[in-house]
Structures are given as structure tokens and as C-alpha cells.
């Protein structure tokens, strides 16, 4: 019943604080208009225990029945964002509240904004809850594993319709300021319920927002107000620490700026951060070293599957000075014995994935050494997950994975369910096209378990997936965690 569902949605807005009580009638009228409805009756309905997902589902069903939208996930997602926007304050009101709360403390401001980003359904809590998450203990610490199920699968109708639609270059990408309030298209998400907090980084306008897919607590994105490409240089380090000074309870890192070792969006300058301590941040330094001329910065090699130098200092400037020196040295560094080539045929290979944070009184910067060289044996990258691990993960190892969180493809959920059944019943895994790619891996680990039962098979699979992710990270490390690898790492440190 339309009136019933509208009343519930408005009440949800009031309960969460995104809609003031004084705007009840105004908001009701905005919603009626979206349903082409001239009438309204204030009906009696149960306003206790309101569940947003259920209210929206009812309203979307009504919109589809009335022919206002096509009944497919793409169109439903565009329309429910429109519905939520009717409950929302204007951007300037949210910005004003944010900075008022910031005067109390940076945490108070981000707590408010994170809750708002969820209450507005920009972060769809009920979808995030579907993600599968677990942890795996390794020699490097406890790694986080997630199978990402919150990104909606594209439905075939929407793909076909998007193919026929006129192509648009507005907004230029999903990280542009122009997304705020944008109604979206089948090939570009609706962002009408999205609100960005403008901040100043290096005297330039930047935006601060949360990721709608929240891979970890308070997963935020900090992005340039201009659509300019990613670049790792001194300026990038300065930008990271400008943000850390604003929000010292958050870390902030950047993807590398080269293909294969970079993230999925290299075309728009941006960083990712949040209020979470990854395994990498907990990893100890295995040996300290001092770089001549930079004696006031503590430096060391981190015990981590990727090759990481950690810098610490009470002051930001000396930290950035040394980071720039390490970056420039690494960019031009070749060590043939360790298969590190700065460039081949004029194509550069060496770059860095940096992560900045504040630890007590110290500013800290982790510099992850990356190289994107390819060979015939490893066409996707020598320091990239090798082919035998592609059944679990073949995508780029970006910032989030570097820090110790696996973001694994949604296909794995169904494949793991099938594998459980095949392992328990002793069926031939190779006979099923969907899971045949996992057969060698299962053959490898099965002998390590004396008994696999319905009670422990899921836990065993989760642990084995975690071990594969650990191997993935080791593949991405330019210096392996063995005697030979450490010797080669020492050679690089020696030239600093």
C-alpha cells in the first residue's frame, strides 16, 4: 500500500535524524510526486522496528507495478536513490554540521558523517552484510579475507539497454565531484543521496567521502577536485600527510601509479583510508637502518610478504624528504641478479604503494616497493599473482590487498559451496566445469587433513583460501622473504 510505505519511509528519515520532524509534510509530498500521486491519506500503520530494505522493496514493487520503472535491479537502484534523496538535507547543511562537530573532535565529525552515509542508503548496509568475511593466521600476522557480494551483479537487460544508450562523459568518472546529486544511468550509479565533504589538500579543493562498498571500517576515499591522473611523487606524500593532520585517527594510502601494480582507477588522483588497523600496520620491523643525511628519521624493513620500508619521525618534512629520496632511487634502480629492472624499451617498471598514518606522537609512512615487469612465463606480471593462484585471485594487487585484506570475486561463494559438496561426497571435482580449476589445489591440501566432515569443511576451505592469498602477496613482493631476497633488499638499502 503506497501511503503506508511512504509514511514508513518518512518516519525512518525522522528516526535516523536525516529528516527533521518539521519537514514531514514536505518530504511526504516529494515522495507522492515521484509516484505521480495527487492524493494522500494519513493511514494507521505500525511504525515500530522499521527495516529500510523492506520499505524500499515495497515502494520499488509499487513503482514497477505502476510502470514508473522497469522491474530490474539496475532501474530499482536508480529509483530507490531518488526516494532516499527526498529524506536528505542539502549538501551545505551536512557540511556545516560536519565542521561544527569537527570543532568537538575529528572523530565526532567522522562518526556523524559515517552514520549519515549509511542512514542515507548511500552505503547499503543490507548489501554489505552479505559479504563473506573471515580471518586467517599466517607467519606475517592475521590476514583479512572478504568475498565481495555487495556490488550488484549487472542484469542482462541493463547491459543491453546501456549498450544502446547514448554514451556520456559526464561525470568523467565515478570519483568526480560531479557525482554528488547525479541521477545516474544504467552504466553509472545514481548518487542523489550522496554528500561529499569538501576539504583542502595542498591548497587545492579535494573531496572526502566513504566508499559505498565499505571493505573495512570507515573505508574512505579522498579525491582531487580535478579529474587528473594518479601520480606517486613528493607531492603525493605531502597530500597524504595533509589529510593525516586533519584526521589523525585515520590512515591514508595510495595505489601505485603504474598498470598491473596500481588500482582499477588510475585516471583520477585519489587515496583510500579509514579507521582500521590492518595486519601490515601491526607487522614488526625486522631490522632498522639509517640513511646518511636523514638521521632524524627511523627506517626499517617490515616483516611482510611484500617488500616494505617503514619510516617514522616526529616531524613530517624529514619523513617526506627521505621518502622522496627512496622513491627516486627506486624508480631508477636495476638489480639484474634480483630480476629488478627500472625499465625495458623505455617503459618504466618501478613505483611505490605508500601508506601514511600517525602512531602516537610519530608520523609513519610505509613504502611498498612495486615492479610491473612482465615475461613470457608471467604475462600478467612477474610480481603479480602467478597463474597457479588465479583460480582464487588474478586481479591486480592494489592498496587494500597490499595492507593485508583480500577482496575476492563474488564467483567464489558459489564455487566454495560446490567444492564443499564435492569434497564431502568424494565426487570428481574435474568433472564440473565451474570448479575444475580448483582441483589441483584441493588435491594439494586434502592429504593434510585426517578427517573432513560437514562440521569442519567450511573452516578448512576458508583457511586454505587464506593461505592462497598469503601466497598471492608473496608473489607480489619484489624481494622474497628468504635469505636471498633479504640480501637483495640489503643491496637496495645500501645504495640509499
What is each PLM-predicted segment?
Residues 1-222, 226-229, 303-305, 319-323, ...:
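Active-site microenvironments that recognize anionic phosphate/pyrophosphate groups
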Residues 244, 248-264, 273-325, 331-334:
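Catalytic or ion-translocation cores adjacent to nucleophile or general acid/base/metal-coordination motifs
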Residues 259-267, 345-351:
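Beta-rich nucleic-acid/ligand-interaction surfaces
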Residues 206-211, 236, 240-244, 290-297:
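Structured alpha-helical segments in the cores of large, soluble enzyme domains
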Residues 192-197, 227-252:
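Helical scaffold of the NTase/Pol beta-like nucleotidyltransferase catalytic core
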